[in-house]
Amino acid sequence: MVLENILEKIVKSKINWIKHRKKIQPLSSFQHNITLSDRNFIQALKNIHPALILEFKKHSPSLGILNDFNPEFVAKIYKKYASAISVLTDEKYFHGKFEFIPIIRNIAVQQPILCKDFFIDPYQIYLARYYQADSILLMLSILKDNQYRALEKLAYSLNMAVLTEINNKMELDRAINLNAKIIGINNRNLKNFSISTSNTYKLASKISKNTIVISESGINSYNQLRKFKNLVQGFLIGSALMSKKDLEHAVHKIITGNNKICGLTRVEDARMSKDFGAIYGGFIFCKSSKRYVNLKKAMNITKNVHMKYIGVFCNENISTISYIIDKIPLYAIQLHGNENQFYIDCLKKKIPKCVRVWKAISLNGEKKHANNLFDNVNKHVFDNIHGGSGTPFNWYLLKNYNLKNVILAGGLNIKNCISASDLGCFGLDFNSGIEISPGLKDKKKTFLIFRSLREHKTIIH
């Protein structure tokens, strides 16, 4: 479909929808059953920084059908991570339903629910609260000031919060004059549905610190959350999650990053790593390592816990690597020895195309990485001279280099994980910094690291 002036089409459609809904479900049939909201949307956004409003929607005008997830499935995942949950209720363009709200709310019992729709009539607010929404979205792009005030007043009378959405400087000025308590900056152009996160940069700095600011649309990576963390109080994230096959995996990638727990030797440690948010789990097949794991143990772990596993090898015969790939589902091979370009090229020819190759580069003060990068690899892992040493290298060596395909390793722990994340690498590789002893991971240390990454601050208790 042509996206030009899609907003005008949606509003025209909404007027007709309201007329029809009023006939089949008149206000008089349910108004007496409406109760006041008992979940505090504003407080939920203040509890953890950054706040995360995770969205349930099945369809998007710009992307089409996103998924076939049912609301129960999504609620069970979102309740573990969300400050609040947004539910799209527009039927024609987003395949939403008001009936989704109580389903999600009854499972996610701690989170307030944001009803996200194109509100133009008081009837819709009554309907949203009847279905147990705790807050609504009011878009200044489709409302005049007097309409906004009337709808806001009604929402407040039902103890509901209002997220005021703006798209440009003119709407921001209106929101400020209207004393909006929560302002959502939509990074999507509502006329053609293009996205630019620079909209948040341009507008957020002009808003009072006493106002809660939410960045909406186009948020799809942990690095974006990290970059915007001092500009806004939270994020509304929808399509970047709902378009992925593995929803919980997608949530982890956005809220804590592409992180790896290496040196796994036990099923319980792999399960813990996945539950806390690790995207990758590492098996060290180097026999000289204190964290060496044999094939039998690795096979048992992969059968019991499904995640993206990385096999770490040191100067190993390619035939041995191929044999192990046949036995366990490895996402990538990490080369941690003295493998040269010829070795890498030969390896790539022998292993399945779906298996990536990562190459570790050892750094010290005398050797900069620019002269030691390899071709034909998917990622580089920057580490200390000796992996698993528990000592970080001098991160100053990374200055002025593109780190988007670099995984940072070497002595990462609770004390330096936030500084490490601020470097902007693709991901972080944790090993000795979260251990009780070599190969045995510490639950508390692991939890605190991922909680710190989630909240973008060091948490030691």
From Swiss-Prot:
Name of a matching Pfam family: IGPS
EC number: 4.1.1.48, 5.3.1.24
Region (Indole-3-glycerol phosphate synthase) location: 1-258
Gene3D superfamilies hit by this protein: Aldolase class I
GO molecular function, one term: phosphoribosylanthranilate isomerase activity
Keyword Amino-acid biosynthesis set for record: yes
Residue ranges, annotated region (N-(5'-phosphoribosyl)anthranilate isomerase): 259-461
Record keywords, A-Z: Amino-acid biosynthesis, Aromatic amino acid biosynthesis, Decarboxylase, Isomerase, Lyase, Multifunctional enzyme, Tryptophan biosynthesis
InterPro entries to which the protein is assigned, alphabetical: Aldolase_TIM, Indole-3-glycerol_P_synth, Indole-3-glycerol_P_synth_dom, Indole-3-GlycerolPSynthase_CS, PRAI_dom, RibuloseP-bd_barrel
Family annotation (PROSITE patterns): IGPS
Catalytic activity: N-(5-phospho-beta-D-ribosyl)anthranilate = 1-(2-carboxyphenylamino)-1-deoxy-D-ribulose 5-phosphate; 1-(2-carboxyphenylamino)-1-deoxy-D-ribulose 5-phosphate + H(+) = (1S,2R)-1-C-(indol-3-yl)glycerol 3-phosphate + CO2 + H2O
GO annotation terms (biological process): L-tryptophan biosynthetic process
Associated pathway: Amino-acid biosynthesis; L-tryptophan biosynthesis; L-tryptophan from chorismate: step 3/5; Amino-acid biosynthesis; L-tryptophan biosynthesis; L-tryptophan from chorismate: step 4/5
Function: Bifunctional enzyme that catalyzes two sequential steps of tryptophan biosynthetic pathway. The first reaction is catalyzed by the isomerase, coded by the TrpF domain; the second reaction is catalyzed by the synthase, coded by the TrpC domain.
Family affiliation: In the N-terminal section; belongs to the TrpC family. In the C-terminal section; belongs to the TrpF family.
PANTHER family named among the record's database cross-references: INDOLE-3-GLYCEROL-PHOSPHATE SYNTHASE, TRYPTOPHAN BIOSYNTHESIS PROTEIN
HAMAP family: IGPS_B, PRAI
NCBIfam families documented for this protein: PRK09427.1
Protein name per its UniProtKB record: Tryptophan biosynthesis protein TrpCF
